[in-house]
Amino acid sequence: MSRPNWFIALPLPSQADWHQASRSAPPALRRFHPADLNLTVAFLGPCGAARAEAAWLALAPYASAAPSVSAGSWRALGPAQQPSAYGLLLDQGRVELERLLAHWGAVALEAAGCAASRRPPLPHVTLLRPKRRESAPWMQPMQAWMATAPLPSQSLRLEHLALYTWSRDRSERLFRIVH
């Protein structure tokens, strides 16, 4: 197995039902486990545990400052020709989160000794990914599905930051929370 990636994120509360919105998506896509749903603050990559811990500690003072959020629309993420993920963009809380993510992300990346992000923050929650090494027969059905797909009606309070890495058994859950 390659070196695990690390990231800091705002986990969706355990009572959130946002994963239900992806149930009717084309079956060729892999659905995230409800406990894996999060809003990424800083992707640290394979930086190692010590550097990830430094990033986590740098963000500790901000741990409870996130706003309430609501889903706004579905979006394909990654390259337009072959998206790498599908998720929900945020409506309520989006502007405040863009500001917070820009600041928090910069603090975390610097503390971990990682390069600064070149992309502006895009507050979203990823729910679906294509299965690896597949051609894209699901792209057109997915575009049609997103045009009419349900949105979660429940607003959520993102209550705390968490440090994530890969799950030890990725067959069920992709990630595990370290802190």
Predicted regions: what they are:
Residues M1-H179:
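Histidine-dependent nucleotide/RNA phosphoesterase domain, centered on the 2H-phosphoesterase fold
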